[in-house]
C-alpha cells in the first residue's frame, strides 16, 4: 500500500467488481424496508431548555429530563408512523456531528471552515464548522447514552448514527491545526481509533444497526468545496481513497451487525451545499464494507439512478425519495414509480425507502412542521409496506 494511504495498515482498498469483498459476509440480518435517516425536529420547549442550560439557568439533571421527554416523543412518533427502524431523533446533539465535538476534547466548536449553504432561490446561510486545535482526547462515550436510552424505552428495532472519519476530515486546517497535528493523517489516525472504539462499545451494549453519516463524500463532487479542501492542506483526489480506507477501519468486521452509510449534499435549515450525481464517487459503493447505502434522491440535484449499477449485488440501497427539506407531501404513486425506475439498476428486493436526510441536522431544524414530518414518515412506512410488505429476516453468514 502506498505510504500516503498507510493510515490504517490492516485495511486494503480492493479492485472494483460486482463485490470487491467476496470473502467477507455482506448479508444483513434484517432488510428494513422503511428507514429514518436520523434527526427529527426538536420541540420548542427543548430549544428553550438548551438555551437556559447553556446560560447556567438549568441544572444537568433538569435538562436531562427535558431531553428524555423529547426522545420519548420521537420514539412514539416513529413507531406510530409505522417505521420499521427508529432513532432517538438525535435530539441530544446540537448538530448531527455534535456527539463527536461534545464528547472529544480538542475541537474549537465554531472556529473552522465556514461552508455556505443555499437553496433554489439563491438564499444563503453560512455554517461555521469545528476545527481541531489540540490533541484529541475522548472524555466520554459518543453515542452509548443515546443507544442505551432508546433500548430501555422500547423493544422496537433501533439504530445509532455516528459521524464518519471522512466527514471529520473537514475539521483539519493546516494552519489552525498544525500545533496539535503536523499532518491531516496524524489527526485522522487518532480520530479513527476513537470512532472504532465507539463502534465496539455500541456493539457490546447490544446495538445491531449502526449508521455512519458522511455527507462530505458528495462535497468531493463540487469544484468550490474541492478547492476549500486544498486550501486547508487536504488533497481532494487522495481523500476519496483515504476516506474509504478510514470508514472501513472504523466499522471493522462484526458478523451480525448491520452498517449503513448515509450520503447527502448538505442539510441545514432546508438548505444544501453541493449537487451532482453519484457517478464520480461510485468507488464508495464498490470498495466500502457497508451493508446499506442511504442515498439522497429527492430532487434533480442528486442526478439519476444510473450510478446504482455500481452497487454490489449483496448490498441494499435505501432510496431517500421523500424530502425532509420541503413541506409538500410527495405522491405515493410517484414514489412507487421512482422505486420501479430504480429497480432497473438494483433489484427490487435490494431496495428500501427513507426520507432524503434528517429533518433537523442542526438544532434549528428544516422549514417543515411537526405535522409535515409525521405525514412524511407515515408516507415512507405505508409506501414501503405496500411495495415490499414487512421487513425480511435473512440468515447471516458468520
Q: PLM features: residue spans?
A:
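Domain-level signal for soluble alpha/beta catalytic cores
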Residues: 3, 25-398
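Extreme N-terminal basic, low-complexity initiation segments
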Residues: 2-10
Amino acid at each position: 500500500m502506498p505510504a500516503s494511504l498507510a493510515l490504517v495498515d490492516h485495511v486494503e482498498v480492493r479492485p472494483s467488481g460486482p463485490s470487491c469483498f467476496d470473502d467477507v459476509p455482506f448479508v444483513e440480518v434484517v432488510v428494513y424496508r422503511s428507514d429514518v435517516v436520523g434527526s427529527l425536529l426538536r420541540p420548542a420547549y427543548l430549544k428553550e431548555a438548551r438555551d437556559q442550560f447553556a446560560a447556567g439557568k438549568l441544572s444537568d439533571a433538569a435538562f436531562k429530563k427535558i431531553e428524555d421527554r423529547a426522545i420519548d416523543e420521537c420514539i412514539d412518533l416513529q413507531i406510530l408512523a409505522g417505521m420499521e427502524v427508529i432513532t432517538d431523533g438525535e435530539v441530544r446533539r446540537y448538530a448531527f456531528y455534535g456527539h463527536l465535538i461534545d464528547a472529544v476534547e480538542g475541537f474549537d466548536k465554531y472556529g473552522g471552515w465556514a461552508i455556505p449553504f443555499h437553496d433554489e432561490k439563491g438564499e444563503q446561510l453560512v455554517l461555521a464548522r469545528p476545527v481541531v486545535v489540540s490533541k484529541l482526547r475522548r472524555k466520554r462515550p459518543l453515542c452509548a447514552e443515546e443507544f442505551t436510552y432508546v433500548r430501555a424505552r422500547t423493544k422496537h428495532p433501533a439504530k445509532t448514527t455516528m459521524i464518519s472519519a471522512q466527514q471529520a476530515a473537514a475539521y483539519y486546517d493546516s494552519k489552525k491545526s498544525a500545533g496539535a497535528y503536523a499532518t491531516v493523517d496524524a489527526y485522522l489516525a487518532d480520530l479513527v481509533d476513537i470512532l472504532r472504539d465507539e463502534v465496539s462499545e455500541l456493539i457490546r451494549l447490544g446495538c445491531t444497526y449502526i449508521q455512519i453519516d458522511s455527507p462530505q463524500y458528495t462535497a468531493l463532487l463540487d469544484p468550490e468545496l474541492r478547492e476549500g479542501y486544498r486550501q486547508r492542506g487536504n488533497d481532494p483526489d487522495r481523500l476519496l481513497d483515504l476516506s474509504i480506507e478510514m470508514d472501513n477501519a472504523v466499522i471493522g468486521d462484526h458478523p451480525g451487525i448491520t452498517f449503513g452509510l448515509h450520503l447527502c449534499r448538505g442539510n441545514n435549515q432546508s438548505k444544501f451545499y453541493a449537487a451532482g450525481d453519484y457517478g464520480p464517487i461510485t468507488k464508495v459503493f464498490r470498495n466500502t464494507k457497508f451493508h446499506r447505502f442511504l442515498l439522497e434522491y429527492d430532487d434533480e440535484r442528486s442526478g439519476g439512478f444510473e450510478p446504482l449499477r455500481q452497487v454490489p449485488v449483496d448490498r441494499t440501497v435505501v432510496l431517500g425519495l421523500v424530502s425532509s427539506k420541503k413541506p409538500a407531501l410527495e405522491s405515493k404513486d410517484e414514489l412507487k414509480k421512482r422505486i420501479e425506475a430504480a429497480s432497473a439498476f438494483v433489484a427490487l428486493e435490494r431496495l428500501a425507502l427513507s426520507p432524503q436526510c434528517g429533518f433537523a441536522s442542526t438544532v434549528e431544524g428544516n422549514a417543515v412542521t411537526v405535522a409535515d414530518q409525521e405525514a412524511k414518515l407515515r408516507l415512507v412506512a405505508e409506501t414501503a409496506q405496500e411495495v415490499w410488505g414487512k421487513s425480511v429476516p435473512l440468515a447471516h453468514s458468520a
